[in-house]
Amino acid sequence: MSDKDTGMAQELKIPPSALMLGLAGLIPFYGLAIWQGITPDELLSERLITAFVLYAACILSFLGGVGWGLAMSETDQLQRGLTFGISTAPSLVGWAAAFINVQNLPFSLSILAMAFLLQGLWDWRLAASGRAPHWFGTLRIGLTIAVISALALAWMMRPELAGTSGSL
């Protein structure tokens, strides 16, 4: 196998540390989604769903930071500015979803699901274009599906939302 082939194989394989940390990052999503739905304590349930939304907002902000880091190495000024701009959106959307959570949980969860979907697609595009390692796109698509599933689970486990599409 040539050095070029070895390098390509390395770029396709998700580094074990990235995979393990990505999967570990799902624990709060699923733990809070389930716990908030099964606790009989209404006050605790409200605090847990708030923690869930805040965690989602933090993760969105983290993902935006990845884009910011990639933008710093861009040589094309237009591309750099576009990537900087797009990378700020996740933290703003996460903040808005956290703020809205108090007033309208279905809308907040919907915003978060859409934000994670769009961020996952953006990250996949970064990898497909060669601006990020190929493995990053693969990892992000898998984690995006898992996070959106956790958002759906949190929705379904809310007693007041179970079996409804919610009201936006």
Model-flagged regions — what are they?
Residues 44-59:
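Loop-to-helix transition at the N-terminal end of transmembrane alpha-helices
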Residues 153-168:
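Juxtamembrane boundary at the C-terminal end of a transmembrane helix
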Residues 69-100:
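Helix-adjacent hinge/juxtasegments
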Residues 15-37, 144-151:
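The first (N-terminal) embedded transmembrane alpha-helix
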Residues 5-10, 64-76, 120-132:
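C-terminal ends of transmembrane helices
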Residues 19-22, 78-88, 135-142:
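Cytoplasmic-side transmembrane-helix entry/capping segments in multi-pass membrane proteins
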Residues 98-118:
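Transmembrane helix-loop-helix
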Residues 126-148:
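Interfacial loop-to-transmembrane junctions
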